[in-house]
Swiss-Prot record:
CDD domains: MukF_C (cd16337), MukF_N (cd16335). Keywords: Calcium, Cell cycle, Cell division, Chromosome partition, Cytoplasm, DNA condensation. It comes from Escherichia fergusonii (strain ATCC 35469 / DSM 13698 / CCUG 18766 / IAM 14443 / JCM 21226 / LMG 7866 / NBRC 102419 / NCTC 12128 / CDC 0568-73). Coiled coil: none annotated. Belongs to the MukF family. Residues 208-236 are annotated as: Leucine-zipper. This is Chromosome partition protein MukF. Pfam families: KicB, MukF_C, MukF_M.
Amino acid sequence: MSEFSQTVPELVAWARKNDFSISLPVDRLSFLLAVATLNGERLDGEMSEGELVDAFRHVSDAFEQTSETIGVRANNAINDMVRQRLLNRFTSEQAEGNAIYRLTPLGIGITDYYIRQREFSTLRLSMQLSIVAGELKRAADAAEEGGDEFHWHRNVYAPLKYSVAEIFDSIDLTQRLMDEQQQQVKDDIAQLLNKDWRAAISSCELLLSETSGTLRELQDTLEAAGDKLQANLLRIQDATMTHDDLHFVDRLVFDLQSKLDRIISWGQQSIDLWIGYDRHVHKFIRTAIDMDKNRVFAQRLRQSVQTYFDEPWALTYANADRLLDMRDEEMALRDEEVTGELPEDLEYEEFNEIREQLAAIIEEQLAVYKTRQVPLDLGLVVREYLAQYPRARHFDVARIVIDQAVRLGVAQADFTGLPAKWQPINDYGAKVQAHVIDKY
């Protein structure tokens, strides 16, 4: 094998030579997780064979397996894990038959995947990024100082390879676990909606909001530190440009830059995809609510009919007369239904025709003010016109006068921003607020 990387044929030959194989049914995997959990409580990280048998007994009881063959099955499970290099067995001549067991790196890696890594923590991610930032800064300072090959290997390459790269891999693994959690949340939401969507709405909202918040915390933490990390990587890259013999450092820096870009970009893309799924679920719930209105009524009615003899009920219904909208513009007033037929000299004349005639008369009379350039006091003019008409027509006449007056010109006092005084326009309390029109 080479120092920095292995080819596919080399890896295949290595796995074949060492006879690597893993087979973990659900009961064996549960046993391994139980061992890892109990092992975490030991200060020395060691477990005796009796403790492993006790852990196996808990797993066997959980799977409702027979207790008569606990000893034999526990011994087989322990030997199988030792053979698969998940446990290391240590024996001594002084304590024959009382072996000591420790989890192997493979066993720790598998249990970490199922236990520790599934617990997302913003604080943990912040600490990892803080450590990475410190390592990168020290490596960048060492790169700018320069030195011999040993200096570059010890102070630049080693921190990047064995500290920064491993933490990047850990963050990448966290993101991949988040991908699995998102898929699990989607499956849970689908099951909830298939059972009873009305009762599942609150649970779905909780799952959606928790996942969205976790993704956003992860991305915010990464983006906050991303620029500083990239800046230090660029410092190292600039320092290696004048050294032809530092291609191994330059290649490692390029790999780290690509990995950091991939981590940040995938975090944002994951948020965008989750937002789309969130909208899809809410749209489905809204559609289901709209479609279920009549279904709920029909279900309740059907249930009431089925339980009528046990719980009798009476149905009361109302059939009210239809309400007519008298303000409908499309309705034509039929005079013969109200007043009967009228003589020709009392024929009804629509108000629209009267309004047009009145507007023409008022427009002609008000035009004198524009021709003579005389200020038009709208309050006095409206009062004079209203005095000529009955009270029932005051509102319509006042509106016509004001409409025609504002077409003639404007009041310069309007541009001062000061409000005009209220002026009475009839003897019944009506008032108008308008400045004198003096610019035509």
